[in-house]
Amino acid sequence: GLVSTMASGLKSQFGTMGKPFNAGIAASNAVKAAKLSELNFISNPDGLGSSQGFIETHSPNTHLSVYNRSTRLPFRFDKVNYKLHACCHGLHAAIEALNIAKTEKYLSPQGVRAINITVSSSWRGVCDIEKPQTGLQGKFSYHYIAALVICGFNTAALDSFFDEMLANIEINNQMRKITVSFNENMEDSYSSVIVHSEGLSEKNFEFDLKKNQKAIDAYPRLKDKAESLLDKEKTKTLYSLLSDKDNCSAQAIGSWIRAF
């Protein structure tokens, strides 16, 4: 298993330590490549787009004309999406829809009778672990994250995905109420959540990460996530640096990181 994930990124690793390990290898290799480049280590400068290069090797049907070094177009991120929950990206639209249902008083633990979550077929076999056995598997389970939201746990907090949480009786009771459906015509950024609650009419809650991202007030939620991962004092120092945009430097942020 470790050999396979060190050689490539595999969906079979989802729900195990192999997945973040693979991402860590990629980050480590990026740093190593930058350091080697600084030392004038020589490689094919067009290794990405040349004949038999990275793009052609991994996607033989790709039109290499899209990758044209002579145009000198800059490579940039066209947007930044924030990961506000400590779990697989495929669960995020469902969590946002469930949060809306929670706000509208549809998700009391005693009142929920059944919830059906419908998502794109692209998430089948990725984050649809029905009965997670570990906290890591919970990060890839619609059943588990729905139960967390119903029970009022913070989906941005690491301790919501500790192994001992799988023994929580109330979480297990709520997981039994969840069903998951897949629709091949749905965008992978979209989720539909139909809630059946006692004394309330059936209601469908929807969320599309592409279309509704601006509706999310990211700043306080990112701060909440930072506090859950670090601590309030460290987060306070970081945010005081970031709030002074005119004087905030990479060096200052680097010093903050080294202080850990």
Functional labels for PLM-detected ranges:
Residues 5-8, 32, 96:
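Generic structural signal for well-ordered, non-membrane alpha-helices
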